[in-house]
From Swiss-Prot:
SUPFAM superfamilies: Nucleotide-diphospho-sugar transferases, Trimeric LpxA-like enzymes. PROSITE patterns: HEXAPEP_TRANSFERASES. Gene3D superfamilies: Hexapeptide repeat proteins (2.160.10.10), Spore Coat Polysaccharide Biosynthesis Protein SpsA, Chain A (3.90.550.10). InterPro entries: Bifunctional_GlmU, GlmU-like, GlmU_C_LbH, Hexapep, Hexapep_transf_CS, NTP_transferase_dom, Nucleotide-diphossugar_trans, Trimer_LpxA-like_sf. This is Bifunctional protein GlmU. UDP-N-acetyl-alpha-D-glucosamine binds at residues 8-11, 22, 72, 77-78, 139, 154, 169, 227, 332, 350, 365, 376. It comes from Streptococcus pneumoniae (strain Hungary19A-6). Acetyl-CoA binds at A379, N385, Y386, S404, A422, R439.
């Protein structure tokens, strides 16, 4: 039989105090909805239907082409949300997972175990439950002496005895698809909230003598639903611990994993060393034996093997094997650094390609440049790429030596093996093998300093 999935993502999330739909708030680099969608993929659903509502167009954009969408125009409860999927799923034979889009910590393994449990026990409905020492606020799972599920009782309706139950409802379910939609026709809004509750179908199944079961999570953290910023921060913390643990198991060393922030899609090879306060975001990839020191921040970039990045920022760029960057360097988007390049302290590279073995040790700006191999930039070199309206390119060949405190005004080309004298302002192309000196001639005026106030004779 087929598996189907319904993801509930229509809520506004008032307690988040945000215009952004709740399910689009991010945990470890991707939205909560994407986390749930990826986990749902473990059951290989034939159809996945996402129920949208508040700012539906934003939610649909995130999963465009990956799921079908239905709209819940009025927020009339979880049962009502599932009813919205009827045109797509009613009458199909199979098992349907119903899950909230604000549960980013649920794993694909747990959802696979849930649906296998449901099938193996021939249940018409299976509730995903968890156990906690502090069940206050959760619906409790009431079982009979044979451990069969009798009902779900909410906190406000629970007796003193039922309040002692530690097994709680996580809000995730698997149903026989055909029976689900039959039962939904019989639920009503006769409750304090005036809403259709998906939990009411459990009572209907019990009344008709059908089998209802419960599968209990091994890890309570997976049950966390995010309703406010506090819970969002908790989810972030749990997810990052998982991510860091996975990398450590795979051979990555962390000085302080509690102070290291790695997004879920980051790839890290073995033998990488990561110091505290390192942030790796987006689609970043780190090669083997690379060292990332305290304070390094990398976004959507690829760093090769054996690199050393010291307290620097790298954005949307590629860094080859053996490169050293920093401290306090900034590699801005669309840059590429060849093998063994050295970018030192207080150097900024923007939109430039730099050939292997090139060095810019300190206090340099390289913007919109094509730089060859074995180039040396002296301290204080500036490539001037912007005239206030347009940006221009500088081309620097192989084996070029640029003296300290030089200004290279684009568009200009420095040929292979050329040399720029220190303190020069270069406005014209420099041929290969040439020396360019673009500064005023030094003039010494003997004894002139004796006329000035600073001179000891005038004190």
């Amino acid at each position: 039989m087929s598996n189907f999935a319904i993801i509930l993502a229509a809520g506004k999330g008032t307690r988040m105090k945000s215009d952004l739909p709740k399910v689009l708030h991010k945990v470890a680099g991707i939205s909560m909805l994407e986390h749930v969608f990826r986990s749902v993929g473990a059951i290989q659903p034939e159809k996945t239907v996402t129920v949208v509502g508040h700012k539906a167009e934003l939610v649909e954009e995130v999963l465009a082409g990956q799921t079908e969408f239905v709209t819940q125009s009025e927020q009339l409860g979880t049962g009502h949300a599932v009813m919205m999927t009827e045109p797509i799923l009613e009458g199909l034979s199979g098992h349907t997972l119903v899950i909230a889009g604000d549960t980013p910590l649920i794993t694909g393994e747990s959802l696979k175990n849930l649906i296998d449990f449901h099938i193996n026990h021939k249940n018409v409905a299976t509730i995903l439950t968890a156990e906690t020492d502090n069940p206050f606020g959760y619906g409790r799972i009431v079982r009979n002496d044979n451990a069969e599920v009798l009902r779900i009782v909410e906190q406000k309706d629970a007796t003193d005895f039922e309040k002692q139950i530690k097994e709680i409802n996580t809000g995730t379910y698997v149903f026989d698809n055909e029976r689900l939609f039959e039962a939904l026709k019989n639920i009503n809004t006769n409750n304090a909230q005036g809403e259709y509750y998906i939990t009411d179908v459990i009572g209907i199944f019990r009344e008709t003598g059908e089998k209802v079961g419960a599968y209990t999570l091994k890890d309570f953290d997976e049950s966390l639903g995010v309703n406010d910023r506090v819970a969002l921060a908790t989810a972030e913390s749990v997810m990052r611990r998982r991510i860091n643990h996975k990398h450590m198991v795979n051979g990555v060393s962390f000085v302080n994993p509690e102070a290291t922030y790695i997004d879920i899609d980051v790839e890290i090879a073995p033998e990488v060393q990561i110091e505290a306060n390192v942030t790796l975001k987006g689609q970043t990839k780190i090669g083997a034996e690379t060292v990332l020191t305290n304070g390094t921040y990398v976004v959507d970039s690829t760093i090769g093997a054996g690199a050393v990045i010291t307290n620097s920022m790298i954005e949307e760029s590629s860094v080859a094997d053996g490169v050293t960057v920093g401290p306090y360097a900034h590699i801005r988007p669309n840059s590429s650094l060849g093998a063994q390049v050295h970018i030192g302290n207080f150097v900024e590279v923007k939109g430039s390609s730099i050939g292997e073995n090139t060095k810019a040790g300190h206090l340099t700006y390289i913007g919109n440049c094509e730089v060859g191999s074995n180039v040396n930039f002296g301290a204080g070199t500036i490539t001037v790429n912007y005239d206030g309206k347009n940006k221009y390119k500088t081309v620097i060949g192989d084996n070029v030596f640029v003296g300290s405190n030089s200004t290279i005004i684009a568009p200009v080309e420095l040929g292979d093996n050329s040399l720029v004298g220190a303190g020069s302002t270069i406005t014209k192309d420099v041929p290969a093998d040439a020396i360019a000196i673009g500064r005023g001639r030094q003039i010494n005026k003997d004894e002139y300093a004796t006329r000035l106030p600073h001179h000891p004779k005038n004190q």
